[in-house]
Swiss-Prot record:
Lineage: Eukaryota, Viridiplantae, Streptophyta, Embryophyta, Tracheophyta
Consequence recorded when altering Y27 to L/M/W: Reduced activity
Function of the protein: Involved in the biosynthesis of cannabinoids-related terpenophenolic natural products, which have pharmacological activity. Polyketide cyclase which functions in concert with OLS/TKS to form olivetolic acid. Has no intrinsic polyketide synthase activity and requires the presence of OLS to produce olivetolic acid.
Tissue specificity: Expressed in glandular trichomes and at lower levels in female flowers.
Subunit structure: Homodimer.
Name this polypeptide is given: Olivetolic acid cyclase
Cited SUPFAM superfamilies: Dimeric alpha+beta barrel
Positions of 3,5,7-trioxododecanoyl-CoA binding: H5, Y72
Organism: Cannabis sativa (Hemp)
Amino acid sequence: MAVKHLIVLKFKDEITEAQKEEFFKTYVNLVNIIPAMKDVYWGKDVTQKNKEEGYTHIVEVTFESVETIQDYIIHPAHVGFGDVYRSFWEKLLIFDYTPRK
């Protein structure tokens, strides 16, 4: 059964919109490199609710299973992405779940 991997981000104040675009363009391209990643969506919060924590963006990745998330975590392309872009965010939340209706 598919698993959704959500990443909610609060970027550092000094990160520009151009840098954020670069961040997301590079991250979305990981789906072409890491077989475990089946689909990726990202976006910016469009409401003004719950802004006190400063989170502004979200990424949603689809994996085939919990086990394939582990393949993604240790994949050299994912590790390399983190090495380059870790300094962009002030904090993030990660949540993995199995969708239900």
